[in-house]
């Protein structure tokens, strides 16, 4: 049942494609005919050679006349094949040109729609506003960079010098190791107390 409701696919084969196919088929038939005539000419030449060898000169001459006629046909076949191939190339190139033209047409339509949405005046306005924004930001940057006076610069240098001096005035750490001796007062505290002895 699915086939009953399925949409019929559109054939992608164009009239130009059919024409190219027919031309190529005719070309292939001519090439087959050309191959057949070429083989026949080779056989007839060998046969004429044999007739001359057998002393049948008139028959050989008649056969060579036929061969000459077939060679002329072969030459015409070459020209026809060349014409067919040229026509195939022309049609295929014309198809490419048509696709290019269709692409250009679609592109032009989109450009027109874009131009309708955005006019030249709007573009100029946007560019002008963008330039104004850039100029405004530049002025802000200049104000920020030029806001420090000479006094401010001097105060910054003085503060930098003061911080440097603080680092220089810090006491140095002792370079020798500390001794393990107990201070004298601590030694006195640790002495044993004298004990009183009762008189006898």
UniProtKB/Swiss-Prot annotation:
Motif Type-2 MIT-interacting motif: where in chain: 168-179
Transmembrane segments: none
Entry keyword set: Coiled coil, Endosome, Lipoprotein, Membrane, Myristate, Protein transport, Transport
Residues with lipid group (N-myristoyl glycine): 2
Keyword Membrane (UniProt): yes
Residue segments, region Disordered: 165-200
Family: Belongs to the SNF7 family.
Functional description taken from the UniProt entry: Probable core component of the endosomal sorting required for transport complex III (ESCRT-III) which is involved in multivesicular bodies (MVBs) formation and sorting of endosomal cargo proteins into MVBs. MVBs contain intraluminal vesicles (ILVs) that are generated by invagination and scission from the limiting membrane of the endosome and mostly are delivered to lysosomes enabling degradation of membrane proteins, such as stimulated growth factor receptors, lysosomal enzymes and lipids.
Protein name per the record: Charged multivesicular body protein 6-B
Source species: Xenopus laevis (African clawed frog)
Gene: chmp6-b
């Amino acid at each position: 049942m699915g086939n009953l409701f399925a949409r019929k696919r559109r054939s992608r084969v164009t009239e130009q494609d059919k024409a190219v196919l027919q031309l190529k088929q005719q070309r292939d038939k001519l090439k087959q005919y050309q191959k057949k005539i070429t083989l026949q000419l080779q056989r007839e030449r060998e046969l004429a050679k044999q007739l001359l060898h057998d002393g049948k000169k008139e028959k050989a001459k008649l056969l060579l006349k036929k061969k000459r006629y077939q060679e002329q046909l072969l030459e015409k076949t070459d020209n026809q094949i060349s014409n067919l191939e040229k026509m195939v190339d022309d049609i295929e190139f014309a198809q490419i040109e048509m696709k290019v033209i269709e692409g250009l047409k679609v592109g032009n339509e989109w450009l027109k729609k874009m131009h309708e949405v955005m006019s030249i005046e709007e573009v100029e306005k946007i560019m002008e506003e963008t330039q104004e924004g850039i100029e405004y930001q530049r002025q802000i940057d200049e104000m920020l960079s030029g806001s420090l006076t000479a006094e401010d610069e001097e105060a910054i240098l003085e503060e930098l010098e003061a911080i440097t001096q603080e680092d220089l005035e810090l006491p140095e750490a002792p370079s020798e190791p500390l001794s393990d001796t107990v201070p004298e007062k601590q030694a006195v505290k640790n002495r044993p107390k004298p004990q009183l002895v009762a008189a006898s």
